[in-house]
Regions:
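Catalytic-core segments of nucleotide cyclases and related cyclic-nucleotide turnover enzymes
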Residues: 11, 15-19, 50-82, 88
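GGDEF/GGEEF active-site signature
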Residues: 3-51, 83
Length: 88
């Protein structure tokens, strides 16, 4: 697992960027040799959109919220994006 933090002008733009990444990985058709879930490598994404963080927000809070979204993507079938506005 890894995190990507980036600035965008809108939530729709963030979703578009992440969907493009998800699709590019899927299109690579990298064989997942020992996977019992799928034949090819895919990615599940938890995307949290923060319009404006409070001054006392910390990175642990943000990470915890986005991590929950990632596991929603995995639990709902993988190879997808789960997104939500995050208020911190």
């Amino acid at each position: 697992e890894f995190a990507i933090i980036f600035e965008v002008d809108s939530k729709d733009n963030a979703i578009s960027i992440m969907e493009n990444l998800r699709k590019k990985v899927e299109d690579l058709k990298i064989i997942a040799c020992n996977s019992t879930i799928c034949n090819y490598l895919t990615i599940s994404i938890g995307l949290g959109y923060i319009k404006k963080a409070s001054p006392d927000a910390n990175s642990d809070q943000i990470y915890d919220e986005v991590d929950k979204l990632l596991y929603e993507s995995k639990d709902n079938g993988r190879n997808q994006i789960t997104t939500r506005d995050i208020i911190v």
